Amino acid sequence: MDIKVVNHPLVRARLTIMRDARSNNVVFRDALADLGAMLIYEASNDLETESFDVETPVSTAEGHRLKNPPIIVPIIRAGLGMIDPALSMIPDAQVGFIGLARDEKTHEPVPYLEALPDDLSGQPVMLVDPMLATGGSLLNAVELLVEHGADDITCVCMVSAQPGVDKLVNSGLPVRKLVTATIDPALDENAYIDPGLGDAGDRLYGPRNIDLESR
């Protein structure tokens, strides 16, 4: 699996805004949108293109378009914030959804939604989630994609923790690439990324209201 840490001044600047505890929901959301577009740009640099003739106001030029646009799959809830940035870069992409919430007692992912095409074989998939912490949610989502035949998976995460990256690398799952803005060294006692940026879903949308024990 290829791991790409995007080291760019604008990436570092937006990431700093997201890390800052003083950033309110609006500021955090705007920074996430900018950073999301930058990471999708990096993640898409090896998508296959096809050429065609395009008429300019002067003559004919060679044009290019994606031969097989990817499907963008956010892990709900925080991943929802990455849909618009992804579509701004790849407007002809499809969108699927995987809903996973973290059980705060066990730190394990609890699935509650799946909306994916029946057959993803031969289809580039970009699995997007701002955080890769323990790796539990991401691996759960990758396994769902594989069950639907996915064989070309790129994970796009803004902040990754080394334990989660190691878990993904050692999973044996067919993830081709991880694109991230940073790899933080550790998790705290509550399995949050340290230093991280807190709960991305809460900082985007406010505290969640999902009763996991009733599911």
Swiss-Prot record:
5-phospho-alpha-D-ribose 1-diphosphate binds at residues 77, 102, 129-137, 199. Pathway: Pyrimidine metabolism; UMP biosynthesis via salvage pathway; UMP from uracil: step 1/1. The keyword Lipid metabolism does not apply. Allosterically activated by GTP. GO terms for biological process: UMP salvage; uracil salvage. It is an enzyme of class 2 (transferase). Its EC number is 2.4.2.9. Binds 1 Mg(2+) ion per subunit. The magnesium is bound as Mg-PRPP. Keywords: Allosteric enzyme, Glycosyltransferase, GTP-binding, Magnesium, Nucleotide-binding, Transferase. Uracil binds at residues 193, 198-200. GO terms for molecular function: GTP binding; magnesium ion binding; uracil phosphoribosyltransferase activity. It catalyses: UMP + diphosphate = 5-phospho-alpha-D-ribose 1-diphosphate + uracil. Its cofactor is Mg(2+). Catalyzes the conversion of uracil and 5-phospho-alpha-D-ribose 1-diphosphate (PRPP) to UMP and diphosphate. HAMAP family: Upp_B. NCBIfam families: PRK00129.1, upp. Belongs to the UPRTase family. This is Uracil phosphoribosyltransferase. The lineage of its organism: Bacteria, Bacillati, Actinomycetota, Actinomycetes, Mycobacteriales.
